[in-house]
Structure formats: structure tokens, C-alpha cells
Amino acid sequence: MTPTDAKRPLQLNDQGQLRHFLSLDGLPRELLTEILDTADSFLEVGARAVKKVPLLRGKTVCNVFFENSTRTRTTFELAAKRLSADVITLNVSTSSTSKGETLTDTLRNLEAMAADMFVVRHADSGAAHFIAEHVSPDVAVINGGDGRHAHPTQGMLDMLTIRRHKGSFDNLSVAIVGDILHSRVARSNMLALRTLGCPDIRVIAPKTLLPEGIEQYGVRVFTDMNEGLRDVDVVIMLRLQRERMQGGLLPSEGEFYKLYGLTTQRLALARPDAIVMHPGPINRGVEIESAVADGPQSVILNQVTYGIAIRMAVLSMAMSGQTAQRQIDSESVSEEQQ
């Protein structure tokens, strides 16, 4: 596991604007801040009677979800519709991929429908990067989660949640707790927090759920929950990803909750104004107590609201970056012909 797994040139156009959104690795602090600022401006749209702006009118956004996720798919659909885009959601279970069609063939057929942007979720790490390398240069690709690798929009909505509740990342202590090994959210959060200047990033997990080389992310590692939670400002809980586990990693869910579950008593070890986050879906009584998930320090539902704004920001910025690159390429061709 290394924190250097994305090719920056593929994600950005020649002017340094967002073109694809595949990973937070390699993206500069200024760009992450621009995404947060843009999302902040879109939060107001959600409070309007008519929740629409015309930024993507005439554009088609295609959600290609090879992995189920009600929350991510729905918020991407809402984000695109609030930007006035036409939205197609591919039901992969009934698509030609289940009949043996390759991923590239599926995307070529979608391109023939004149889609301008793909939002891709896939069980294989690197799938979004592969797609971005093989689609038409006019199409933007957004990673909605790929294997264990990355979930960049979740990472950014978590950063927006933290910034709106804590003001900035300076002097913050943030703890990420649970199944770090299988979590693409953990990877994206660690990269984002480091880039945005968070000075104290902690990961708390049993040794069997910690990936090798995690120290390269500039984090402090704790296997004792009580020690790791002491005086933190933010607690990000992660679910146990049983579907990605092979036997022997955990004795039982009950044992995990006993050692790493976030209870009211454990939360008291954090700062009194600490916030509690979770990317969902929540496993109550496994990684978090209901009293904490529904309590006054929980901002879990805020994360869902902020997720729409972040995805609006990413969709609009990537489309703008693609348009700018087409203009750059067109001008280059004109100069060569003169």
C-alpha cells in the first residue's frame, strides 16, 4: 500500500483544472480547497424552492455502477439533476456485461449515446483509472469508488463536513477507526487530511485490519481504542467490510464491538465538542452504538447533505475542465495549420 497511486496529468488539464476525478493523490491543496469552496456555494441551491442551476444543461451524465450503493448513486443523480444535466443510470445486473461484454465495449456503447461524463463505481481497484485512459478525450470520468483503492468524493464530503463544523484543519486531531485494510474511504480521507494540513491523523484498528505501509500516509497508528481516541476533535467510524474479508481477520463482530465499538463512554475520551462521522451504511452494535450514531455529536446525516454539494462541485468543475481542454487542443491545432 502506497500513497502514490494516481497519475496527476490524467486528472488535470493543461491549465491545472480538474478533468477527471479519480483519486485525491497528487491533487494540490489549492484544488481541494477550490472543490470545498465550490461545494459551499452549492449548499444554498439545496435550500431553494427550485433546486436547480443551469451549469450542465444539455450535458448527459451516465452513472455506471457495477457495485451497489444506494447513497452514492442517489446523491450523484441528485447532484447532476440539480445542475440541470440529463442523467442515465446503468443497471449493470441487466446490462450486457452480465452476458460477457467487456467493460470497454460497454463504455463504447455508452459513448455512442453521446454521454459527456461517466460516474463509475466498480469492485476492482483501478477500474476508474482504466476507463479514463480508454474513453474519448471529450468524456470526463468520476470515480464513485473502486475496490479498496479510492472514494474521492466521499473523502471530499468528509472534508467539507469537518471544515463546516471545525472551521479549518489547523490544529485538529482526527481519528479514523475500524476496517482500515479494506476501506477506500480511509485511504481517501488520509490523503485529503494530509494535503489540507491536518497535523494529527490517527488510525485505530486491530493489527489484522491495518494494511502494510500505512505509516507512509503520515498517520499515527493505534491498536488500543481508548488510547487513540484521547482528545481527538473528529472521529470517523468505518464499517466492517465482510464482503472483502477472507477468514481469520476477526474473532467475531461482538468481540470487535467490545474492543473498537464507539460507545458513549468511549466518546467521552475525545474532546467535549468532538464530532462523530460515518460514511455509511452503519452497522449499529458492531462499530457504533445507536446512542452515539443518533446523539448530539453525530453529524452523519450532515455528511449526506454535504455529499450532494460536493458531487455538484466535482461534476461542474470536471465538465468545465474538459471544455477548457478542448479549447486548448483546438487552438493548438489551429496554430499548427497556420
Swiss-Prot record:
GO terms for molecular function: amino acid binding; aspartate carbamoyltransferase activity. Catalyzes the condensation of carbamoyl phosphate and aspartate to form carbamoyl aspartate and inorganic phosphate, the committed step in the de novo pyrimidine nucleotide biosynthesis pathway. Pathway: Pyrimidine metabolism; UMP biosynthesis via de novo pathway; (S)-dihydroorotate from bicarbonate: step 2/3. Carbamoyl phosphate binds at residues 71-72, 121, 151, 154, 280-281. This is Aspartate carbamoyltransferase catalytic subunit. Keywords: Pyrimidine biosynthesis, Transferase. L-aspartate binds at residues 99, 184, 239. It catalyses: carbamoyl phosphate + L-aspartate = N-carbamoyl-L-aspartate + phosphate + H(+). Its EC number is 2.1.3.2. Gene3D superfamilies: Aspartate/ornithine carbamoyltransferase.
